[in-house]
């Protein structure tokens, strides 16, 4: 017997309805900029982690849940609706702080997969990644 994914499932979803107002966007930007900034790194591949300017050139900070509670509630609502309509995972919840990223002129983040394929640390937990 071969088990396949249901035909209704999607693997990439794009939403075009605005989630945040311009004022809310500015509040998120301010929250991200007020946190400690660090050079973005890459990781997950054996022997290749840390700063890799061929894959990524940007600066990041992490937005604490307590700093933007309403933002996280709004994102979770969209995530749960999107999950129900396209993926069907059980018990979805936000477990990671939002990563705020700024790109200098010429900065970028090349195509990548957020996972540790070798599973040296622990099994992957992230089911859905979202970009705002």
Predicted regions span which residues?
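Fe(II)/2-oxoglutarate oxygenase catalytic core
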Residues: 1-132
């Amino acid at each position: 017997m071969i088990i396949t994914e249901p035909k209704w499932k999607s693997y990439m979803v794009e939403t075009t309805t605005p989630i945040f107002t311009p004022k809310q966007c500015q509040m998120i930007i301010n929250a991200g900029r007020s946190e400690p900034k660090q050079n973005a790194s890459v990781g997950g591949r054996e022997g290749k982690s840390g700063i890799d300017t061929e894959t990524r050139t940007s600066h990041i900070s992490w937005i604490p849940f307590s700093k933007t509670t309403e933002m996280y509630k709004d994102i979770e609502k969209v995530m749960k609706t999107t999950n129900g309509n396209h993926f069907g995972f059980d018990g979805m919840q936000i477990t990671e702080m939002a990563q705020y990223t700024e790109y200098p002129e010429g900065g970028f983040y090349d195509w990548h997969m957020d996972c540790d394929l070798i599973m040296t640390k622990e099994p992957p937990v992230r089911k859905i990644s979202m970009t705002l």
